[in-house]
């Protein structure tokens, strides 16, 4: 199965680098992450024939609740089902993110060779995620790991 097209709300298997691991520059594993922002960065200023690069902002989804230095919310059973995630309790962390080039560090889902995405967060859950994420950004408390 080929890589999916980049889309907002898409949940992919991505080698997320937690802010606390940033010095190591080595993610511990691929995990579900939701693409919350996409934009195109033009390289035309430096090279008129240069390519445009797609940049993505990923937020992590974890079976472990956010710790004291993080904030997030638990996904509803409906959201997990629609997004293609397992039925165990899962949280999306909204207080940190990775900024990376698409599709760098997207990996096949463990046990599903050739499959790179789980599904999509349903609109209601994505809106909740987006609002919480923007709140952290506006308060200037969002922790960004730039992986470019």
Predicted regions and their residues:
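Short, charged beta-turn/beta-strand-edge "cap" motif at the junction between a beta-strand
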Residues: 17-21
């Amino acid at each position: 199965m080929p890589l999916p097209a980049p889309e907002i709300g898409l949940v992919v298997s991505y080698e997320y680098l937690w802010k606390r691991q940033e010095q190591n520059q080595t993610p511990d594993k691929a995990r579900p992450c939701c693409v919350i922002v996409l934009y195109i960065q033009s390289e035309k200023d430096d090279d008129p024939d240069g390519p445009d690069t797609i940049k993505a902002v990923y937020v992590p989804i974890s079976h472990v609740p956010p710790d004291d230095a993080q904030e997030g919310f638990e996904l509803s059973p409906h959201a997990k089902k629609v997004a293609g995630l397992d039925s165990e309790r899962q949280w999306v962390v909204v207080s940190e993110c990775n900024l990376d080039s698409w599709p760098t560090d997207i990996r096949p889902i463990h046990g599903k060779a050739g499959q790179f995405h789980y599904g999509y967060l349903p609109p209601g859950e994505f809106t909740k995620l987006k609002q919480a994420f923007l709140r952290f950004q506006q308060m200037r408390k969002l922790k960004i790991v730039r992986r470019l």
